[in-house]
Amino acid sequence: MHFDIAVVLFVIMNLALGVKMNLKNTLLAFTTWTSIGNSNWYITAVLGMYLIIILAFSVFRKHKLPALITVSVLTVVFAIVLLKVGKPEWYYNTLLLFPVGMWYAYLKKHIDKFVMKNNLTYMFFMVAAVGLFTVCYRIKGFGLPFYWIYACAFMMIIILITMKVKIGNPILSMLGRHVFGIYILQRIPMPIFQRLGLNGNNMLYFFLCFAVTLLMSAVFDMLMKKLDKKLFA
């Protein structure tokens, strides 16, 4: 529902700017399948993964292992479907990280204990992850499996860093609370400021877009919370 309300804002913006829209594409934009200027691929991916998880855990319920295997297999199928219907690569090239993250959570206690056994073991895995990332960066264009390995290697590096370093501050926390609003609304100020000719100064354009996006996302999230309370309280 929040996504569709955001799409309505894009419809209003396009009408105000005189951007042409056809009915079919506009209606499909409300399903996340197409776009009228809004970001949509991430929502398509998340909705698909939610459906896969609901299906897997509805069938296997408390049996986590077969549910995880099912999620992994269906994620690969989902990625292949998106590839075959002609969706851009960013729709599916990081999908596998979702079940990989679930596997890590499932085995976290054992993985962390083994990796953090001593500094030598930790450095071995860090060097291996960085090496794999570097190699796969050069060959990631050879096919989806190579990109998945590249993406997983990057995720491994981040996980290994967070095993040693705690990352967090009020700014990151604030951005995390408003991540959906920022993601979905960021493309509204961009064309408006472009139309006003403010994109001639890159720094001014960037900071204006960033500031307005933050303000819009904060207001949007506040209004959505109030709407949710009225509808679901």
Predicted ranges, named:
Residues 12, 125-230:
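Alpha-helical transmembrane segments of multi-pass integral membrane proteins
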Residues 9, 24-34, 50-59, 78-84, ...:
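Short juxtamembrane and helix-loop transition motifs at transmembrane-helix boundaries
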Residues 80-87, 104-114, 159-167, 189, ...:
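Juxtamembrane membrane-interface segments at transmembrane alpha-helix termini
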Residues 35-41, 59-66, 88, 114-118, ...:
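Short, amphipathic, aromatic/basic-enriched membrane-interface segments that mark the entry/exit
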Residues 17-18, 61, 82-86, 194, ...:
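Short helix-capping/hinge motifs at transmembrane helix termini and TM-loop junctions
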Residues 1-35, 49, 114-125, 174-184, ...:
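Transmembrane alpha-helical segments and their boundary/interface "anchor" motifs
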Residues 50-74, 103-123, 198:
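Solvent-exposed interhelical
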Residues 30-45, 81-100, 132-157, 202-207:
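Interfacial loop-to-helix transition and helix-capping segments at the boundaries
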